[in-house]
Structures are given as structure tokens and as C-alpha cells.
Amino acid sequence: VMEIIGEISADIVAPNAEGVDHEGPKVVDNHVVYAPGTAQNIEVMAKAGLFGLTLPRKYGGLNFPLLYFVMANEMVARADAGFENIWGLQDCAETLNEFASEEQKEKYLTRVCQGETCAMDLTEPDAGSDLQAVMLKAHWDEARGTWLLNGVKRFITNGDGHISLVLAR
């Protein structure tokens, strides 16, 4: 697996890096569309089964120890640090794997393992990244069957990700 990550990083991700930097993502119909090179990187990594590296097999992951994810992440970062920021955020799923209900794990972890990207919503205007100073409030709306958020986030890491890990009180 590490050899495959190295090959994909060297043969696909690295050659795409310069073009991705020049072209960048675009907003189309209020949605972020990755540069073609980034989209190709995601597709190739997903087809190779390299999302969900540390997640349990029952969700489609490889069940690797974190050390292997860190090593793989370094290989991807060497090829393209910008893409590493997208691919590496699969680590958000570790929080779900640790704390989510089984229903939530089935819903979200399988999607990460299939190549859907994650976003990390932590930073706030008056708190920065001081996690204890977070003011965003969350409450469950029984009538709608969903969580409602009240507050402000900024500098969302990979804000266009399919699955967001939001820090709230």
C-alpha cells in the first residue's frame, strides 16, 4: 500500500501540482469545482482505496495504524502540499470513528472511504483556534430532525468538503 501511495504521489500528484497551482479551483453555480489535476488526484486515490487509510474495514477502510497514515501523508505532501491538505483531512473521520454513533459511522465513514472529502470547521473570529474559547452553539431541532448552528466560523479548512467536522458547544 505504501508503495502504491508513493507511485501515485510521484506519477500523478506531483506532475499535476504546477497546473493545479496555476489553474486553482473555480466557483460554478455556487459550488467549488476543483482544478482538473486535483479532481484526477482524488479520483485516482479513491480508486486505489487510499481514503480511509486508518478506518475499520467494515466501513471500507484499510484499518492501518496511524503511523502509516502519517508516512503516507508525508509522501503526498512532498508531491503537492495543497493536495495533501485535501487528502489528509480524511483524518477528520478519526473523530467520527471515535465518538459517533454506529448509525453516523455507517453514514459518514463509508463515504470518506469512497473518496468524499472532509472539511474542518474550527476557527472563529474571536477565538482563533483556541478550542476552549469556541462560541458557536449547536442545538438539536426535533421538528426538523437536524442540528442547528448559531455563530460564526472562518478559515474553514477545505470548506468545500463533502463532510464537515464542526466544533460547537
Region annotations inferred by a language model:
Residues I42, M135-H139, F155:
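Short, surface-exposed charged micro-motifs
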Residues T146, N150-R169:
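A short core secondary-structure module
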Residues P25, G88-L89, A100-D141, G145:
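Internal maturation/activation junctions in enzymes
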Residues Y59-N63, C92-T95, Q104, D126-D130, ...:
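Flexible loop/turn segments at secondary-structure boundaries
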Residues G52, P56-R57, A79-T95, Q114-E124:
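Core alpha/beta catalytic barrel or barrel-like domain that forms the active/cofactor pocket
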Residues V1-F83, E103, K107:
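Amphipathic, small/basic residue-rich leader segments at the start of a protein or domain
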Residues L50-L53, T117-A119, T146-W147, S164-L165:
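Structural motif
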Residues G49, Y59, E124-D126, E142, ...:
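Short, flexible loop/turn elements at secondary-structure junctions
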